[in-house]
Amino acid sequence: MKKIFSLVLCVLMVFALMAGCSPNVDSGDGQTSVQTVEFPVTVTDQIGNEITVDELPERIVSGYYISSSACIALGLEDKLVAVEEGTDQRPIYQLAAPELLETAGNVGSAKSFDLEACIAAEPDLVILPKKAQDYAQTLKEMAIPAIVVSPESHEELVQMIELIGTLTDTVDRADTLVAKYEELLGKVENITADISDEEKPYVYMCGTNSYMTTVPKDMYQSSLIAAAGGKNAAENIDGDSWTDVSYEQFLSMNPDVIIIPSNNMANGQPDYSADDISADPQLSEIKAVKDEKIYNMPYGFEAWDSPVPSGVLGTLWITAVLYPDEYSMEDFAKDAADFYQEFYDFEMDTSAIV
């Protein structure tokens, strides 16, 4: 039933987005005008709420680092009047939109959204994470349009980008971003196309707080592993959030590769190291430990295992880890640098990667 609802919701979102956008028009000289949005526009957000925005938003509040990163990629940083807490600890702000560190207000976190600060920012569009969805109705009653985003898969990340693009009249930029996203995923598909299911390695992705926490089958990070040509070692565990495992479960999974993600903050470091995993006597018989295939995801930019627009780089990096002969870290570093230059307008230091 959940899958059927998701499919219907996706179809409704597509039609809603199409209805709000005027088509590209041939000007008669062979040039095609930039696609624009006609306001008022009505859309369906990612939990099924219908929202109407009467005029082009000029003051945006984003209560979620994922939607904030998407807004920066869409060139909307000048319209962000308030964002989630902790911006001074997220490298992407310093690299791509340092002015937000001085100008943007603080509306708290997904778990503790500050409604009063949000209202004080006088927004004409609010973007909320699913954990703060209850505030959407309150804002609607105050005539402040609010959408809820929940990008827990590649497809839902694309939907979020297109949704924000429609509501902010940045459809052309959103289309360019999605096209790049699909181009990079297509590159990975070509690299892994001839690899049989039996040849694909089992990958265990740790949590940042503990290596005894991992990614169940319905979590976004599981889709990164699959897209990169791997198999989630925890594919038999149900759920869509970080899940604790026992040593017995870890040993039973016996992954070929262990990945330690970055924590999305300035120091980028989780609460443990690869050496801690290698030194744990209860994990000594795991294949990844014996083969010394424990890898730290690069840090200092964004957490590439999260559903931000640059999350596609997480898939590329895992591909380089799993299939270095087909796609090297040097290849990845170039693709990552090109991505950040095009959509975040900064020159990436690739030394931490290669």
What function would you assign to each model-found segment?
Residues 1-8:
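Positively charged n-region of N-terminal signal peptides that target proteins for export
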Residues 8-16:
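Bacterial N-terminal signal peptides
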Residues 18-32:
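Bacterial lipoprotein signal-peptidase II cleavage site
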Residues 43, 49-52, 135-213, 234-236, ...:
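Extracytoplasmic substrate-binding proteins
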Residues 61-63, 79-84, 125-129, 146-150, ...:
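Structural recognition of the beta-strand scaffold that forms the well-ordered cores
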Residues 62-121, 125-131:
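A short, structured surface patch at a secondary-structure boundary
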Residues 107-110, 114-128, 144, 246-263:
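Proline-aspartate-enriched helix->loop->beta-strand connector
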Residues 214-242:
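Alpha-helical, coiled-coil/dimerization segments enriched in small aliphatic residues
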